[in-house]
UniProtKB/Swiss-Prot annotation:
The name this protein goes by in its record: Short-chain dehydrogenase/reductase family 42E member 1
GO CC annotations, alphabetized: membrane
List of catalytic residues: 152
Encoding gene (name): SDR42E1
Secretion signal span: none
Subcellular location, record wording: Membrane
Family designation: Belongs to the 3-beta-HSD family.
Species for this entry: Macaca fascicularis
């Protein structure tokens, strides 16, 4: 943002207590923008001077309206969502309340409070549902809702459509119109990331990372948190009149622009923490069957014990099936330029927080986890193999 203009900017970030929302807020604050973080949970890090945090539930319109009070908000970054991975993917009711109901509330509040710009954080998953996509672009149609393998992706697709369809909505009192756009990021990584990397490191430390799966030539994408911050700031600018409202009503794919095999991407993390990268490779369909089995077990037992599934079906697709997208539209219309990053920062972060292999540690726990993993894999194999093969054994 232009420093001279940014002095008059006030932005509200839903999901501002999370990893990415907080990083975005800090970056905007450094540019002189007045930042309001809105989230149900407070940030894990110390809130810098000049940033205001308001605790509230996006599912409650009254909470959102309180956050809008006493502030002439010029842009909302709607990042808050629920159900991205793990056991959260299986809580359909809360996923729908947050991702669809929360988005409806934000759109209503923007209209009432005469907010001129809204940037929505979407996902690759509105297009991808397990099919191979190579260098796809924004002209691709939405994946039909009934084909989504999880409710998170389905609700994010519905919410993105609502946001883009709201572009041009008249604001209250005839004070202009609402300009909206949506960014579709790849999987986020960076030092201190709180969702994906800690789960992966936990599996590594428990001895559960015993195999990889799928075609070794499969390619996926990731986006460093700082590249995603850059994209959101550029998108907010591209909704302004001095940029010709070029981003109005538009979706954009955002990534580092470097397709890579999922497991090779994480090799530096595994080896950097002192562990051995697995050499065993399993068929994708077998692992998908295993994921389906764990989801069924969670469905049956989840109310008694809400355990973390080892993998969900969507996670198998996301990590084992080729899908990557062109950045040309984001480059041309937003001026997006992905900077080069790797996992070294994350490795150092985990080491600084006490992670990394120490000889002889956790052996008994790893043995228990190994046994459980082998047991579930045997069941998955029995389900996966054709019945004629099983009967002949």
């Amino acid at each position: 943002m232009d420093p001279k203009r940014s002095q008059k900017e006030t932005v509200l970030i839903t999901g501002g207590g999370g990893y990415f929302g907080f990083r975005l807020g800090c970056a905007l604050n450094q540019k002189g923008v007045h930042v309001i973080l809105f989230d149900i949970s407070s940030p894990a890090e110390t809130i810098p001077e000049g940033i205001k945090f308001i605790q509230g539930d996006i599912c409650h319109l009254s909470d959102i309206e309180k956050a809008f009070q006493d502030a002439d908000i010029t842009c909302v970054f709607h990042i808050a969502s629920y159900g991205m991975s793990g056991r959260e993917q299986l809580n359909r009711n809360l996923i729908e309340e947050v991702n669809i109901g929360g988005t409806d509330n934000i759109l209503q509040a923007c209209q009432r409070r005469r907010v001129p710009r809204l940037v929505y954080t979407s996902t690759f998953n509105v297009i991808f549902g397990g099919q191979v996509i190579r260098n796809g672009d924004e002209s691709l149609p939405y994946l039909p809702l009934h084909l989504h393998p999880d409710h998170y992706s389905r609700t994010k697709s519905i919410a993105e459509k609502k946001v883009l369809e709201a572009n041009g909505t008249p604001l209250d009192r005839g004070d202009g119109v609402l300009r909206t756009c949506a960014l579709r990021p790849a999987g986020i990584y960076g030092p201190g990331e709180q969702r994906h990397l800690p789960r992966i490191v936990s599996y590594i430390e428990k001895g559960l990372f015993k195999f990889v799966y799928g075609d070794p030539r499969s390619l996926v994408e990731f986006v460093h948190v700082d590249n995603l911050v850059q994209a959101h700031i550029l998108a907010s600018e591209a909704l302004r009149a001095d940029k010709g409202h070029i981003a109005s009503g538009q979706p954009y794919f955002i990534s580092d622009g470097r397709p890579v095999n999922n497991f090779e991407f994480f090799r530096p993390l595994v080896e950097g923490l002192g562990y051995t990268f697995p050499s065993t490779r399993l068929p994708l369909t077998l692992v998908y069957c295993f994921a389906f089995l764990t989801e069924m077990v969670h469905f049956i037992l989840g109310r008694l014990y809400n355990f973390q599934p080892f993998l969900t079906r969507t996670e198998v697709y996301k990590t084992g099936v080729t899908h990557y997208f062109s950045l040309e539209k984001a480059k041309k219309e937003l001026g997006y330029k992905a900077q080069p990053f790797d996992l070294q920062e994350a490795v150092e972060w985990f080491k600084a927080h006490g992670h990394g292999r120490s000889s002889g540690s956790r052996d008994s726990e790893c043995f228990i986890w190994d046994g459980l993993l082998v047991f579930l894999l045997i069941i998955a194999v029995l389900i996966w193999l054709p019945s004629s093969v099983i009967l002949s054994l």
